[in-house]
Amino acid sequence: HVIGYEVQKVLAVVDWFAAENAKQPIAAPIAVAGYHEGGLIAFYSAALDTRIQATLVSGYFTERNRVWEEPIYRNVFGLLEQFGDAEIASLISPRALVLEHSKTPKLVAPPEVRPGRSSGAAPGILATPSTANVLAEHGRAKKLSAKGSRIALITKNDKNTLETFGTDRALEALLRFANVIPNANWKTSKEPTKELQSKPPHHRQQRQVSELVEYNQRLLRFSEYERTESFWRKLPPAEPAKWNAQCEPHRKQLWKEVIGQFPAANLPINPRSRKILETDKWICYEV
């Protein structure tokens, strides 16, 4: 999954920091921060890796009950059966989490058709989360998390959306939660030196997309051999009566590791229909 690929890159950086910490007499704290899509990646990374001591998530945290309206990569199969954003936040607890309710750009997918781009992409909308939804999910997160958990919500006047991300209050909370106590002059209005200024990321973005494409192409090239070794060789021809028993471990792996499993049908059939279209010659029903 594309979210997993991005998370793995963050965790690789955490590996590097942890390796550097092992060389030092006093380990430096490890924190992650992200805005908008980066907030999603920081959020999931912190839930997975306990070495991350403090996390700042800006412009992402909210209720996910309508995740199907968002871009398709966010609509992870079976996610909402167990995990809304509050549940993910509880996985970070008791480590520190700073949630910044900031404004995000509105994006509507798919992009317009143009030369080289077809109209085949799935629809989806990204927009600034509503304040009511953010407050409600924050309240759920606090109830689900361990007693004394440090989950700070940064908003404008305690109830409105911030116009910018990475505000002084959010960054200071992140530093304090990471046990880095900033001095009175920790912030500056000066621009970073030329060496620290990021160049437009278009070329870097293209390289990362190319990495993902090549990685998946490589998996496709070798998948036949992997399937033979890990699957078919473990299912040699046998008596038909033993086939179901032979397949059971692979069936469970498919359910648990690949596509998920629908719950068993334990309710009576309840078909329903509704009229969706009518002409002078026929009526169409949805069943």
Indicate where each model-derived feature is located.
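Gly/Ala-rich beta-loop-alpha elbow adjacent to hydrolase catalytic centers
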Residues: A31-A42
